[in-house]
C-alpha cells in the first residue's frame, strides 16, 4: 500500500481523499492540538502537535519517515482575498509554504528516495506568490545540495499548477483552489492517473 504524510493536516479532509483512493496515512503534522487529536482519531495514528516551521532545520526533516507521497495545505489566511481585501501580510504564509517545499525537496533528492509525488493546495491568490520552480538555493538547501553532489542552482522542485474548481469534479459546491505538485519519474501508472488534472 502506498503511504503519505499530510502537512497542515487539520482534522484530515485532504488525507481523507487520498485514504479513499487506497493510500495509507502514516503521519499528520499540525501545530493545533485539537486538529492533531481529530486526525489521529480519524486515521488511527498517534501523532503529537508540531510546528511546520520546525522543519526549517534539516535535521528535523531527516527524522521524518519516508513516504510515497507528501501532501500539504498551508494556511490560506495570508493569501485570502477576504483578508484585508487580499492586502494582508504574506510573509508568514510564504515562509510556511517554502518550509513545506524544503521538506519535499529533501525527500525528493535524498539518496534512496522513495518519494513518487507531492501535492499542495491553497486559495487561488496564492498562485501569485509561488514560483514556477525553486532551486536548492531558493530553499536554503545549499549544504544539502553540495553533500548530495547537486548544484545549488539546479531546480529542486517544479511548482507550476492550476486553479481548479471542485464543482468540476463532482462536488456540489463551487470551491476554487490553486493546486500544484509533481509526479516523479519513478511514479507508477496508478498514481499518475490521479494527477492528470494538474496538466
Please provide the spans of the model-predicted regions.
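Class I SAM-dependent methyltransferase "Motif I" SAM/SAH-binding loop
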Residues: 7-11
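The conserved SAM/SAH-binding core of class I Rossmann-like methyltransferase domains
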Residues: 28-29
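Short, conserved SAM-binding/catalytic segment
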Residues: 37-48
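Class I S-adenosyl-L-methionine
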Residues: 58-67, 76-199
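Extreme N-terminal starter segment of soluble prokaryotic enzymes
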Residues: 1-4
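A short, Lys/Arg-enriched amphipathic alpha-helix followed by its capping loop at the start of a domain
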Residues: 17-24, 42
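Conserved SAM/SAH-binding beta-strand->alpha-helix loop
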Residues: 32-33
Amino acid at each position: 500500500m502506498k503511504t503519505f504524510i499530510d502537512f497542515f493536516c487539520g482534522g484530515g479532509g485532504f488525507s481523507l481523499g487520498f485514504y479513499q483512493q487506497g493510500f495509507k496515512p502514516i503521519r499528520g503534522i499540525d501545530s493545533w492540538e485539537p486538529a492533531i487529536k481529530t486526525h489521529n482519531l480519524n486515521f488511527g495514528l498517534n501523532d503529537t502537535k508540531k510546528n511546520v516551521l520546525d522543519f526549517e532545520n534539516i535535521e528535523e526533516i531527516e527524522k521524518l519517515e519516508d513516504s510515497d507521497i507528501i501532501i500539504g495545505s498551508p494556511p490560506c489566511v495570508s493569501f485570502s482575498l477576504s483578508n484585508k481585501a487580499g492586502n494582508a501580510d504574506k510573509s508568514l504564509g510564504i515562509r510556511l509554504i517554502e518550509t513545506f517545499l524544503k521538506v519535499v525537496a529533501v525527500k525528493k533528492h535524498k539518496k534512496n528516495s522513495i518519494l513518487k509525488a507531492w501535492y499542495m493546495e491553497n486559495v487561488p491568490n496564492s498562485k501569485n506568490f509561488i514560483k514556477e520552480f525553486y532551486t536548492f538555493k531558493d530553499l536554503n538547501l545549499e549544504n544539502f545540495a553540495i553533500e548530495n553532489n547537486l548544484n545549488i542552482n539546479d531546480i529542486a522542485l517544479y511548482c507550476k499548477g492550476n486553479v481548479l474548481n471542485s464543482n468540476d469534479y463532482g462536488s456540489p459546491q463551487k470551491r476554487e483552489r490553486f493546486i500544484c505538485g509533481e509526479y516523479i519519474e519513478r511514479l507508477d501508472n496508478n498514481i499518475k492517473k490521479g494527477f492528470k488534472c494538474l496538466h
